[in-house]
Curated annotation (Swiss-Prot):
SMART domains, alphabetized: PMEI (SM00856)
Coiled-coil residues: none
Membership in a protein family: Belongs to the PMEI family.
Keyword list, A-Z: Apoplast, Disulfide bond, Glycoprotein, Secreted, Signal
Taxonomic classification: Eukaryota, Viridiplantae, Streptophyta, Embryophyta, Tracheophyta
Name of protein: Pectinesterase inhibitor 6
Amino acid sequence: MTSSSSSPITFTLLLLLSLLVALNPNPSLASTGSNINTNDIVTQYSTYVRNACNVTRYNRLCVRTLWPFAIVARNNTSKWARASVAVTITDTKRVLRLLLKTQRSAVGESERIALSDCRELFVDSLDNLYKSLAVLRTLNADEFQRQISDLATWLSAALTDDDTCLDGFEETSSRTRTVRMVRRKATKCMRLCSNALALLKKLAFDGL
């Protein structure tokens, strides 16, 4: 990780750690707070997120989007998978809002159709992501294999939806600023979904 990318991570982790110490009702923790080596702690949490993201194709994007969850997720594979789906949901909703806005100002029939089709695909993708998040919140050993199978189906479908949206823009001759912006944001969303699927595969391998 470069210094430019790790700097905001370090700052926010330090801020979160300070808040945890300040808000912790345990006096012993507060009294020993000055003895905590914050640099070592930040390094440890950075290691957690880097280790989690090692299995992903878009590693830098994974680290950048998931590091706020390091304090909670640590070495818990299921928490990392859940966090990645939650992040993808947030980004998918942003893309949907953008598609709704840009569809009204589309230039030409081919652009309007591409934006409309993309919106339908992202609606379906969001539905699959929500179903995935619901299951990730209720994982249990007795149903784990079935749950993993369902999750793989839904996340793969969400990724296919994102890919199909991008393919639609390849087929249109429109290269307006609107199309370029939507493609850029949809590409990020597709990559987040790919990372979520990779983390799910790690969860399937590691187990609960």
